[in-house]
Amino acid sequence: MIKIIPVNTKQLQRQFVEFQYELYKDCPQFVPPIKSDIYAMMNPKKHPFYDHSVADFFLALDGDKVVGRIAALINKPFNAYHQSTDAEFYLFDLIDNQEVANALLDRVAEWARERGMTKIVGPKGFGPLDGYGIQIEGHEHRQMMNMMNYNYPYYQTLVENYGFTKAVDFVSSYVDPQKIEVPEKVAKAASIAKKRGSLVIKTFKNKAELKQWIPQLRSAYNGSFVQNWEYYPLTKREIDFVVSNALILVIPEMLKMIVKDDKVVGFVLPFPDVSRAFQKNKGKLGPIEIIRLLAEIKKTNWIDFNGIGILPEAQGFGGNALIYEILIDSVHQNSRYQHGELTQVAETAVQMRKDLLNLGCVFYKNHRVYQKTIA
């Protein structure tokens, strides 16, 4: 019989975190997250999510053996913004067993009802960089660092058997950085925008120069995704958390901002793919692991774009075209990059998906966020 227990001791926290590493230890596509990041998600004193919202964590046991885990969340600002009563689940991992899946999801449903929620949505995490959904396509491809989730194909069957249906899909696109070209229509629109002079491209030589613009980047980040399915207004501490984590790996020379009247209205955030180093580090982040990450930054031939934003006020001035032109310029800067990915674009971002196809991108991974009414 499967037993579900709350994670309420340090020993159980450790079992919760370690279970994923054991489950995927022989999976070549899996990229282990940094363990301290997962522990931070479980710590109300460290993670800004808990400034406004709540979460609990559960383990599934078969006898004394851990066979699954799940986090149950309520994001109060998201619900307030969307006028919803959603509970969410995340950090969902388990063996291929329907009884285990049912027990974990039943516990989340019970937890949600106790708090007045009427629907469960997920996987959906603690912040915008956590990655959305259960992967339903592209399992043969390596996970893009920890900017998306990776799971075995059977997860889809288990949640759908439970009664979950699709809420929204997030696609990730493959692109050959050295072959991608700016379409004539895009180039013309970008040229007109630059000639008008109202939109200016800002470049950076190093992180010291970039840091001077971080306050403006924070503001632009919060305003660029208001039309996205997953959007809710981030608090200052959440924005600081997201931006500071993103800038650890970002390449200053390739990062571009669009500025209008000294205000950042668009940006492209490129990240060198250090997945191979993460795999070797196995969740650790000591001096040796940091050296390994720094070395991988200099030699990886993969680049990831997981932060392309444009404020609505700039879209009518050719901002969209300018964003794609500078994205392509960024990947052309360094011939070392032979592979690229644009990570997790929601299907509700219809125009952006069309733009990516026009640029020659190929959708090659799909993550599905599920929903189920529980009222």
Q: Language model features by range: what are they?
A:
Residues F126-P128, Q178-I180, K207, D273-S275, ...:
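Short, solvent-exposed loop/turn segments at secondary-structure junctions
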Residues I74-P77, I308, K354-L357, Y364-H367, ...:
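Alpha-helical subdomain
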Residues N149-E230:
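Acyltransferase donor/substrate-recognition loop-hinge adjacent to the catalytic core
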Residues Q20-D62, I70-A80, F204, E209-G309:
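A conserved beta-strand-loop-helix scaffold within acyl/acetyltransferase catalytic domains
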